[in-house]
């Protein structure tokens, strides 16, 4: 009872604090920097991270097994991963806009996890025999961290596409801090060049104003961080798939069975392998790689929620239909 109450308190504190953090980010989009706002959002996300960490540890001790057994626990762990990738740019003293793009992921996953749809999963249950393996921690943690990193990196690529095609919500045009995003800009000419070539390109590129230059710098920053985060997520995903294959051979006698989860995991891996390859090819880099990563954003959600929504295949543990 004590553990259940503590878990309930930590869940609602983390959700409330991250809601405040999102509000702070939205306010800073429309007004000039207010003293203390950025520090408040950073401290707020640290509190959220600590609350989610405490929630996972509490559930671990209360259930007697790692909190990776169902959709609810995996969503909590996913939001924990999002909060980590949110804080990395902040501690690197990067612009606040990167964290603003990533921050909604935390509240969406945390909100869905605590919603009434997953009420039956909130109570800890005995781990099913198929999941009672030492591979559980390696496989599931690597897969979810991979999902979190790839989703964050893909979000930055989506932001690049939105800025490039100038499809932002018109009301944001009133923001002094974001107005530079709406100036004319020949993005195709830049194509994410490296530092050695940047000066040459800048000399032949016509910027109508300093705001145009800031827009270019912002796109470069999004691309640089997106590539780093996706590269890290790809490593996590690869380790997760390989460890899952070994576990599958021990549990089912086959390394690969092509059930829905495995198939979509392979599709996800392929999409981001194409993305990383396109980054090495100057003919495909730039806008093309951002499009590939944006497609990967949708593919990950299909891979993550697909089996849980359908409740089919060998990976249907903790799905909606199984409850």
Curated annotation (Swiss-Prot):
Pfam families per the UniProt record, alphabetical: Cytochrom_C_asm
Alphabetical keyword list: Chloroplast, Cytochrome c-type biogenesis, Membrane, Plastid, Thylakoid, Transmembrane, Transmembrane helix
Gene Ontology, cellular component aspect: chloroplast thylakoid membrane; plasma membrane
Protein's GO biological process: cytochrome complex assembly
Topological type in the membrane: Multi-pass membrane protein
Domain of life, per lineage: Eukaryota
Subcellular location: Plastid, Chloroplast thylakoid membrane
UniProt xrefs under PANTHER family: CYTOCHROME B_B6 PROTEIN-RELATED, HEME EXPORTER PROTEIN C
Summary of subunit composition and partner proteins: May interact with Ccs1.
Function comment: Required during biogenesis of c-type cytochromes (cytochrome c6 and cytochrome f) at the step of heme attachment.
HAMAP family listed in its UniProt record: CytC_CcsA (MF_01391)
The protein's name: Cytochrome c biogenesis protein CcsA
Species annotation: Lotus japonicus (Lotus corniculatus var. japonicus)
């Amino acid at each position: 009872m004590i553990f259940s109450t503590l878990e309930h308190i930590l869940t609602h504190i983390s959700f409330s604090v991250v809601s405040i953090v999102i509000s702070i980010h939205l306010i800073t989009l429309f007004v000039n920097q207010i003293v203390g706002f950025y520090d408040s959002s950073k401290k707020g996300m640290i509190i959220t991270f600590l609350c989610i960490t405490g929630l996972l540890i509490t559930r671990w001790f209360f259930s007697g097994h790692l909190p990776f057994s169902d959709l609810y626990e995996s969503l909590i762990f996913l939001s924990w991963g999002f909060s980590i990738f949110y804080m990395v740019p902040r501690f690197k003293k990067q612009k606040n806009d990167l964290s603003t793009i990533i921050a909604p992921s935390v509240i969406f996953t945390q909100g869905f996890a605590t919603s009434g749809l997953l009420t039956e999963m909130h109570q800890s249950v005995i781990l099913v025999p198929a999941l009672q393996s030492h591979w559980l921690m390696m496989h599931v943690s690597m897969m979810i961290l991979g999902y979190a990193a790839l989703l964050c990196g893909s979000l930055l690529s989506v932001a690049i596409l939105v800025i490039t095609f100038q499809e932002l919500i018109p009301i944001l045009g009133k923001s002094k801090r974001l107005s530079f995003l709406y100036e004319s800009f020949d993005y195709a000419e830049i194509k994410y060049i490296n530092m050695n070539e940047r000066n040459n390109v800048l000399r032949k590129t016509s910027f109508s104003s300093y705001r145009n230059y800031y827009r270019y710098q912002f796109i470069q920053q999004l691309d640089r961080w997106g590539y780093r985060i996706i590269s890290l997520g790809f490593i996590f995903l690869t380790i997760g798939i390989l460890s899952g294959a070994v576990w599958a051979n021990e549990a089912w006698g086959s390394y690969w069975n092509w059930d829905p989860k495995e198939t979509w995991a392979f599709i996800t891996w392929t999409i981001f392998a194409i993305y990383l390859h396109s980054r090495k090819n100057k003919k495909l880099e730039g806008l093309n790689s951002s499009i590939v990563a944006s497609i990967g954003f949708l593919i990950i959600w299909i891979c993550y929620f697909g089996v849980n929504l359908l409740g089919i295949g060998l990976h249907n543990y903790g799905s909606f239909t199984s409850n």
